Amino acid sequence: MNLINIIENSQKKSNITKLFSGDIVKINIWVLEGNKKRIQIFEGIIIAIKNKGISSSITVRKISNGEGVERMFPLHSPIIESIIVNRHSLVRKSKLYYLRNKKGRSSRIKQRLKK
């Protein structure tokens, strides 16, 4: 087997939930402040997913104090404690970059109902 594949497989997390564009997620992240370590929660909508093996990442957008905040998270990073899916949304595109230009109620996305 290829040496790179062996190293990548040892670094991959196996407990990652299935994520889709448009999902509202809550990501718990380990943050270092001085010599203390705590968990910070980042909650928002997934606007992009890049699946590239161990370097897979998601882009999450939230509105904080009226300003849009986007953050990219590598899925297999050790700073991510957990990813919790709060809600699935009904979208027809894989990249939701058009949400950057929307404000208020126009930026809302319909919820996907389970059958």
Curated annotation (Swiss-Prot):
UniProt cross-references to InterPro entries, sorted A to Z: Ribosomal_bL19 (IPR001857), Ribosomal_bL19_CS (IPR018257), Ribosomal_bL19_sf (IPR038657), Translation_prot_SH3-like_sf (IPR008991)
Gene Ontology cellular-component annotations: ribonucleoprotein complex; ribosome
Keywords from the named record: Ribonucleoprotein, Ribosomal protein
Database matches in Pfam families: Ribosomal_L19
GO function terms (MF aspect): structural constituent of ribosome
Superkingdom, natural source: Bacteria
Biological process according to GO: translation
Function: This protein is located at the 30S-50S ribosomal subunit interface and may play a role in the structure and function of the aminoacyl-tRNA binding site.
Family the entry assigns: Belongs to the bacterial ribosomal protein bL19 family.
PANTHER family: LARGE RIBOSOMAL SUBUNIT PROTEIN BL19M, RIBOSOMAL PROTEIN L19
The protein, known as: Large ribosomal subunit protein bL19
Organism: Wigglesworthia glossinidia brevipalpis
Gene name in the database record: rplS
